[in-house]
Amino acid sequence: MWFYLVTLVGLYYLLRWYRERQVVSHLHDKYVFITGCDSGFGNLLARQLDRRGMRVLAACLTEKGAEELKSKTSDRLETVILDVTNTDSISAATQWVKEHVGDKGLWGLVNNAGVFQAFAYIEWCRPEDCMSIFQVNLIGLAQVTLSMLFLVKKARGRIVNVSSVLGRVALFGGFYSCSKYGVEAFSDVLRREIRDFGVKVSIIEPGSFKTRMTDAELIIEKTKKTWEATPEHIRESYGQQFFDDFCNTTRRELKKCSTNLSLVTDCMEHALTSKYPRTRYSAGWDARLFFIPLSYLPTSLVDCLLAISRRKPAQAV
């Protein structure tokens, strides 16, 4: 019995390995639009796909970021300035992409742009903190997708949305996780709605990686500013010792971030170039061995595990 079961499992993974190694043809003719290319995952992916001969259309937030990227790539790569929170900027970028791709359509749309602000409890945050992070991580992503979807449908291409393991497991830390849960839901709905048009949607769920967005000292500085702006009665309920311990733990965990960004960009590249891309890609050992398994446990058990891993607030009952 066990022999047959192990054999079936082995055959399944062998078949999946074979399917996933099959690559789409004529990659050098395919256009890919990537947001958030100033640094981090987007920057590395743009260079990675350019080396592979694909037609990369890289969106950067700043002129400086665009110029630095152009200096490291071939003449095939084109850049455009894009602010995903600005509808006029999105419309202009869409028209620019349309002019470049012509009748071929857009093979790949990679929604990579994102922000990670203060790592703070929700009660410490202001309503505008919620809006600013949702505006980039979720609303901007949705607006870019809706604006360029007709071009992707024309090519029967791919949409790759960058989420996070915090879109699978809600840990302490405010609205970032909330925005990534939104990305997961948006991507699932979109995938099911447009599959009949030949468009495939993949979600990238990175673990902890060292980018500008996860700079420990910058995040701690923002967290302290958020704490200082929190009403006194809320700060008293948590206590200064709780906050200091929270900052120390955050700093310690952020400094463990992996520097191997290619673990993420390789997943993105596979989603764009494989004939049979996955629905979800978990990137990083912490994602695969901790966060994703944690997401399958009963919610009550996860709550208990997280509760015993942190200091209790000063006025906890």
From Swiss-Prot:
Activity regulation information from UniProt: Competitively inhibited by 9-cis-retinoic acid and 13-cis-retinoic acid.
Organism classification: Eukaryota, Metazoa, Chordata, Craniata, Vertebrata
Binding site for substrate: S164
The name this protein goes by in its record: 17-beta-hydroxysteroid dehydrogenase type 6
Residues binding NAD(+), per UniProt: 33-57
Membrane topology summary: Peripheral membrane protein
Substrates-to-products reaction catalysed: all-trans-retinol--[retinol-binding protein] + NAD(+) = all-trans-retinal--[retinol-binding protein] + NADH + H(+); all-trans-retinol + NAD(+) = all-trans-retinal + NADH + H(+); androsterone + NAD(+) = 5alpha-androstan-3,17-dione + NADH + H(+); testosterone + NAD(+) = androst-4-ene-3,17-dione + NADH + H(+)
Tissue: Detected in prostate, liver and kidney.
